[in-house]
From Swiss-Prot:
Molecular function, one GO term: NADH dehydrogenase (ubiquinone) activity
Any single GO BP term: mitochondrial electron transport, NADH to ubiquinone
Quaternary structure (record): Core subunit of respiratory chain NADH dehydrogenase (Complex I) which is composed of 45 different subunits. Interacts with TMEM186. Interacts with TMEM242.
Family membership: Belongs to the complex I subunit 3 family.
PANTHER family: NADH-UBIQUINONE OXIDOREDUCTASE CHAIN 3
Transmembrane segments: 3-23, 55-75, 86-106
Gene name of the encoded protein: MT-ND3
Name by which UniProt lists this protein: NADH-ubiquinone oxidoreductase chain 3
Gene Ontology terms: cellular component: mitochondrial inner membrane; NADH dehydrogenase complex
Enzymatic reactions: a ubiquinone + NADH + 5 H(+)(in) = a ubiquinol + NAD(+) + 4 H(+)(out)
Native species: Loxodonta africana
Broad class of the protein's primary localization: mitochondrion
EC number(s) given by UniProt: 7.1.1.2
């Protein structure tokens, strides 16, 4: 019963938000609205500067380790389960896999974006 109430509530809230989005007035883009704002001054250069590929790789590596933390956060609750050996084994395998990946990136000089 609780599942049905949750699904019904989520469906109704989603439908309500979609209907409100259709009823809201349409916004129109014009040159002043789409230009970058720099403290009241005219823009000096382009706001679309390219990123270094090395910086992008470091950012992706950071996201992977952030995902690892998100996956390991529920571990204290999982340890309270009956079969903790499998949970700990999978957690250690994930940590070892990410440590090997970090070591590989380090050896390949993938973490240095200054060069």
């Amino acid at each position: 019963m609780n599942l049905m109430i949750t699904l019904l509530t989520n469906t109704m809230l989603t439908s309500l938000m979609v209907l409100i989005a259709f009823w809201l007035p349409q916004t129109y883009n014009y040159s002043e609205k789409t230009s970058p704002y720099e403290c009241g001054f005219d823009p000096v250069g382009s706001a679309r500067l390219p990123f270094s590929m090395k910086f992008f790789l470091v950012a992706i590596t950071f996201l992977l380790f952030d995902l690892e933390i998100a996956l390991l956060l529920p571990l204290p609750w999982a340890i309270q389960a009956n079969n903790t050996s499998l949970t700990l084994l999978m957690s250690f395998m994930l940590i070892i896999l990410l440590a090997i990946g970090l070591a590989y990136e380090w050896l390949q000089k993938g973490l240095e974006w200054t060069k």
